[in-house]
Amino acid sequence: MSGTRRPASWWLPRTVVALRVRVFEKVNGDRVVTLPNAAHGPEVFERVYAHPAVNGRSAGAGLSDLFWYWLAPGSEVHQEHLEPGERYEEVAATTRRILAGSSAGLAEAAGRAVADVLDTVPLDRVSLVRLRDLLMPAWAAFAYELVFRRPCPPHARDLITAHADDVITALKCTGLRHPRRRARLTAYLGERIAAGDVPHRLPASLSPSEQALYLQGTFFNTAVVQLSEATAHVLLALARHPRVQHRLSEHPDDDRYLAHVIDETLRLYPLFGIAHRITTGEVPLDDTTVLPAGSVVCFSYPDYQATGHERPDEFDPDRWSDPAARRAPYIPFGVAANRPCPAWRASPIVLRVAVREVLSRFRLDSTASHTRSNPHRAPCLLIPRPLIPGGRRLEALRRFVRLRDGVEDVTRGVRQLVLGTVMVLHARRLRPAARYFEEPPSGRCPVAHPTESKTSRERNG
């Protein structure tokens, strides 16, 4: 299959795409710069991203209201959205402790979780699945074991999966959020903390209810969603590139080539689309332009990682065999100078395990489109290794996947426009981030344990 990606708007009317983009541009306001752009290339992106004054996370950005709305409850204690200070440092240290562990231990836990899910897939026929949906329960169980250091019970796995799916569905504007569904996980985590079931020392600056929200946001939202998305991207890329898949299947212990496949996938389909920061001081953009304090800087990962590579739109894992590729723009886990992903070490380890586990059991095939956002949740045919399906049946299934994908693209695009507009307007009305930072300092001291009020309940959805 060709390495050229099909346009993201296949069958989708250009007017709908343009309208959707305009809706989200309105959220940012006027004091916004997106990097890289026509005037400022990847070198400016890197310099500004690493500038010490580009460290604001939520306060002062209209976009923060939307992200807090999507991620509620507990956005105010989510590690990604905490402002610099003692509270952030304590939360970040806790996350590092929970993620700490041997590579072998992480690999074993991930392999066990993925195998448990794959055991439910029949081996006597071809299965049509959505890869993100298939693997999200595995990463829910993996995250549970990280936090609680014990196997994940089915009830907890279902709660985590339902929560994570609700968050990512809202983020992609393919569905509205369901606060009650998320609240069930919050209540469960609160009960586990009260019972003393968490073997890690949780941040002392957080109240017990905030500790539950911290675990929910960092591990059972972000970790589960990002690992599910990453695995779906890698497997869908393999399904669409049979020669690459065949090479991996024939040489399952080739760590170097598998690393190249993962790198190429995360280069072409970065998990982060736009990361925004707020300047807390003046930041020079070029010789004549200085960004004032309070400016919102949006860092476009897809645009940045498309620079410095030959044939940037082509899926080519072999490009990473060239040492020069390592010097090209590529930051799958962010930049070291500005809060990189805390799972930068663990993620590649467990991703490799998951990919190998799937390929050891199934051959993958997909005619669905592949875009960075993957709103279709990665449709894919799983063909059990011992099975040799009839050519006509397999081709019929491939045609069905292609046709359904095209039809869904039209309806999904319109749905994203409508639901995205609804959520943008709702977030602007609620103003969860803005209202939080407008509260008197005594109501949101980074050390005190604020009591839940009507305002905070509304803020958390």
Name what the model sees in each region.
Residues 1-154, 453-457:
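Active-site substrate-recognition loop segments, prototypically the cytochrome P450 B′-helix/B-C loop
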Residues 300-324:
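Conserved cytochrome P450 K-helix/beta-meander segment immediately N-terminal to the heme-binding cysteine loop
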Residues 320-377:
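Cytochrome P450 heme-thiolate "Cys pocket" and heme-binding signature region
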Residues 1-40, 394-461:
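N-terminal targeting/anchor module and adjacent flexible "hinge" preceding the catalytic domain
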Residues 103-229, 431, 435-442, 446-452, ...:
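Cytochrome P450 heme-thiolate monooxygenase catalytic core
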Residues 224-251, 342-362:
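Cytochrome P450 catalytic-core helices
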Residues 252-289:
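Conserved cytochrome P450 K-helix E-x-x-R motif and the immediately C-terminal K′/meander segment
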